[in-house]
Each structure stands twice: as structure tokens, then as C-alpha cells.
């Protein structure tokens, strides 16, 4: 059973975009179901065909993909095309601040857009600030080009925010943007003549001592985030105008702390009602914040703790579809096992959420902890069979199965492998006989293994299918 279902009534109310344009049939699929975040820059996607990547994604029951785009030159158009052949929609996901953009793909003179903070903790990242209209216009053209050139079905920004989390409550205070450009823009927009101080409580402009001005700053940050998002989506020559029929999702964080909605509004400039009202998305996502995903003790039913965020979406727009993003793997010690995932999906169904996604497909539990699972078998030619596994297998598997009596058909006749080739998660075997007419086969997959060299460190152990393991599957 799928964990996410959407009522027919809700579906029929959201197939038309905010500007009256209907979503394309493939883009509509992003409104519901289980999706994943994919970053094709990881080693596991190297030296294999685009078809094998698409087959692995589909073999895992994925119904939609959020393609995490950092370097535009590295986007795999061939993988997107292969997913489309299989009916899987692909949305582009970008970081709104451009934090991970390679220097050679940043706007000219990008340094003038850079956020500044009260300490050096964020210096390793290169966040660009939402206060700069020319940066928003540059990003708008970039996103439109990405969608149209690579054939994306949808688009979203992750982390359109000022990334300080609880920085105001730390001993070593973290706050931003405090760049001269941001301060000037704030004063110009509000008429305030001073900018708050966040570190030295003895100064007369310490933020707690000037609550009216500080509140102006809170509201100003929210406006800059929403204006940036809105410019990219609804501005002249933006996504709605230049990419008709494309799905658009807005995206804010959630967190399991008391008064979390108000705190993220204040801390990071994230305001669900105004973002939805201004940008008019097809769906709104809640992303799991790092204090939660890094918590090894986090329970799989934690979406219940995010209910204030979910309720606020429905209060803003009762017909707005809701997506929920979880993080299964960013903290190696908190890689979430199958029972945790099962509880998570059951909880999302209980909350009547429309869609889920997770970070990130290639680092999931099964890649590190489980032997390869055979998902489908396909007759390529009368004596050639392609075995599709749920993850990348070792290139040694071709030699492992060579000369093995590997396949038994319905009538009990067995066939040996005379040659074999590995392509990612696909194992193509040439047999010593004709399988034409067979409808179901039994496959000996004992000894099939994965390869830790393709994993992100810590790489873990080799996972091997135990000897004597057989799978009976229909022959497609």
C-alpha cells in the first residue's frame, strides 16, 4: 500500500495553477505520492548508463524525483529523459541562496551579494542575500533556463531563509544578514535610522533594547525572502510566464521545539501564510530542520510534532496540497532503518499529507546495510535476460554468475550463464538456451554483492546475498 493518498476532491481542485494554466499531465504527478531527492554528483552514479539510474529509481517504487541542482553544467539530461520514458516526473530543486553554486556559475560580481554574519561559523558557505533584486533576476533567468533546457516538470527552492536557526540563543551569537548592503536596504525600506546590534548587549541599539526596530527587521527579512521567491516564480519572464504547465512548490522549515512556528519566523524569515499568499504555489513543503534530522533519537512519527506548521498551511489555504521532507541519511549515525521509515510513512498517511520526499536516495539504509534485492527480470532477446536490482551491484557480479546454472523456467528446465555484463544495478546475462514462451523464472542470486567503493564515507561493509538464495519472478 502506498503511504500517501489524496482525495479525488483535492486533486480536482489543484490541477490548475495560480495563473489559470493547467499543469501538464506529468507535472500533476508531483502533487501526490512518494518522491525522493536525487543528487547525481555522487560516485554511485558514475560509470553507468542513464537507463540504469532510472531503472534503480523506479525499482524502489519512487513516483517522482526532486533533482538537486548545484552545478548546471553537470545536470544529466539523459537521466531526466530516461525517467520521463518511465512516466516519472522530475522537478528541479535549487538552494535559494546559491550556497553551493560553483564559483564559475555564480553571477558576475557575486561577492557584493554575499550574506555576512556576526561570526565566522558560516564562512565556509557562500550564501547570497535575498535583499538584492538583481540577484533575484539573475536567479530567475537561471531557473527558467534550467527548466526549459533540461525538461524539468517542476521547480522548488529549498531553504529560502536566513540560515541562523537558534543563533540568537547561543552564547556565540549567530545572526545575519548584517552586510552593509542589507543594512542600507533595511533602513531605506523601513525609514529606521539605526540597525540592531546582536552581540554587545551594552550598546544602545542592542536588538532587545529597541523592540520596534527589531520587529521591523523581522518583517523586512520575511518580505525579502517572499519577494525573492515571487520574482523567480511570478515576475516578468519568470517561471509561470516562460515555463507554462510546470509545477511549483514553496518550501519552509519545520522544527520540533515549543513555539516553533513563531521562532522560525523570527529567526530565519520564514512565514508560511505570506509565502503561500504571495507566491501562490501548487504545493507547500515542510522541510525537516537540522536539529531534528541530526537527532539520533528522533522517532519515526515525529511529523506529529510538526502539526502546528501543517495546520498553518491549511489555515492559509484549505485546498493547498502539503508535502513533507524528511532526512534519512545526512547524519551517518542516524541513518534511518526500515522500521523507522515504515512508521514515518504511516504517520504521514495519518496526517493526510499529499506527498513525501527524503534526502537522499543514494545514501539510504539499504545501500549501506542490506544485500542487493532482485526486483524485476526482463527478456531482452530469446537467450538474454536483464536482472534489475534495487541498488548498484559490484562489477564483479558478472564473473560471479559466469557458468552458473542461474535460471530455471516453469517446466523445470535450467539455463547456464555463458556471459554477463554489469551496468550499475543491471545485470545482463546471456544464457545457453532459448527462454521464449517462459512466463515465470526462478533466479539463483546467491553471491550477488554491492561495492562500498561507490558509497560516501564511512563506506561500511560489503553486503552479499547468501548462497542458495532464489527469487521467483514473472518474466517481463
What label would you give each PLM region?
Residues 91, 156-160, 214-266, 287, ...:
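Aromatic-lined carbohydrate-recognition surfaces of secreted/lumenal glycan-active proteins
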Residues 371-377, 412-413, 435-438, 442-476:
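Acidic, Ser/Thr/Gly/Pro-rich low-complexity segments and short DxT(G/T)-type signature motifs
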Residues 392-419:
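Short, surface-exposed alpha-helix to beta-strand junction/turn motifs within ectodomains of secreted
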Amino acid at each position: 500500500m502506498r503511504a500517501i493518498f489524496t482525495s479525488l476532491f483535492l486533486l480536482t481542485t489543484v490541477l490548475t495553477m495560480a495563473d489559470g494554466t493547467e499543469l501538464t499531465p506529468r507535472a500533476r504527478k508531483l502533487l501526490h505520492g512518494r518522491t525522493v531527492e536525487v543528487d547525481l554528483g555522487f560516485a554511485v552514479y558514475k560509470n553507468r548508463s542513464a537507463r540504469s539510474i532510472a531503472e534503480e529509481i523506479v525499482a524502489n517504487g519512487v513516483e517522482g524525483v526532486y533533482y538537486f541542482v548545484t552545478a548546471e553544467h553537470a545536470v544529466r539530461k539523459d537521466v531526466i529523459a530516461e525517467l520521463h520514458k518511465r512516466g516519472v516526473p522530475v522537478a528541479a530543486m535549487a538552494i535559494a541562496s546559491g550556497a553551493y553554486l560553483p564559483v564559475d556559475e555564480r553571477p558576475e560580481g557575486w561577492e557584493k551579494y554575499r550574506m555576512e554574519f556576526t561570526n565566522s561559523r558560516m564562512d565556509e558557505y557562500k550564501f547570497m542575500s535575498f535583499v538584492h533584486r538583481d540577484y533575484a533576476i539573475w536567479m530567475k533567468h537561471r531557473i527558467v533556463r534550467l527548466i526549459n533546457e533540461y525538461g524539468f516538470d517542476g521547480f522548488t527552492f529549498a531553504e529560502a531563509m536566513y540560515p541562523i536557526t537558534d543563533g540568537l540563543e547561543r552564547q556565540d551569537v549567530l545572526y545575519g544578514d548584517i552586510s552593509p548592503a542589507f543594512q542600507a536596504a533595511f533602513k531605506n525600506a523601513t525609514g529606521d535610522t539605526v540597525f540592531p546590534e546582536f552581540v554587545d548587549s551594552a550598546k544602545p541599539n542592542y536588538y532587545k533594547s529597541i523592540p520596534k526596530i527589531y520587529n521591523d527587521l523581522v518583517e523586512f527579512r520575511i518580505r525579502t525572502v517572499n519577494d525573492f521567491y515571487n520574482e523567480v516564480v511570478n515576475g516578468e519572464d519568470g517561471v509561470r510566464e516562460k515555463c507554462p504547465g510546470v509545477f511549483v512548490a514553496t518550501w519552509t522549515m519545520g522544527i520540533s521545539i515549543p513555539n516553533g512556528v513563531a521562532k522560525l519566523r523570527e529567526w530565519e524569515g520564514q512565514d508560511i501564510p505570506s509565502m503561500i499568499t504571495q507566491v501562490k504555489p501548487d504545493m507547500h513543503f515542510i522541510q525537516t530542520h537540522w536539529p531534528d534530522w541530526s537527532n539520533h533519537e528522533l522517532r519515526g512519527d515525529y511529523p506529529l510534532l510538526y502539526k502546528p506548521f501543517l495546520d498553518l498551511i491549511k489555515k492559509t489555504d484549505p485546498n493547498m496540497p502539503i508535502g513533507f521532507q524528511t532526512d534519512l541519511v545526512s547524519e551517518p549515525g542516524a541513518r534511518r532503518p526500515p522500521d523507522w521509515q515504515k512508521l514515518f510513512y504511516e504517520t504521514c498517511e495519518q496526517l493526510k499529507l499529499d506527498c513525501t520526499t527524503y534526502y537522499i536516495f543514494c545514501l539510504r539504509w539499504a545501500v549501506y546495510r542490506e544485500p542487493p534485492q532482485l526486483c524485476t527480470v526482463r527478456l531482452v532477446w530469446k537467450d538474454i535476460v536483464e536482472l534489475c536490482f534495487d541498488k548498484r551491484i559490484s562489477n564483479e557480479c558478472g564473473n560471479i554468475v559466469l557458468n552458473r546454472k542461474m535460471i530455471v523456467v516453469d517446466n523445470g528446465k535450467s539455463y547456464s550463464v555463458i556471459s554477463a555484463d554489469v551496468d550499475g544495478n543491471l545485470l545482463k546475462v546471456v544464457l545457453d538456451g532459448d527462454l521464449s514462451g517462459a512466463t515465470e523464472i526462478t533466479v539463483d542470486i546467491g553471491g550477488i554483492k554491492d561495492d562500498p567503493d561507490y558509497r560516501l564515507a564511512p563506506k561500511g561493509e560489503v553486503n552479499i546475498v547468501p548462497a542458495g538464495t532464489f527469487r521467483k519472478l514473472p518474466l517481463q
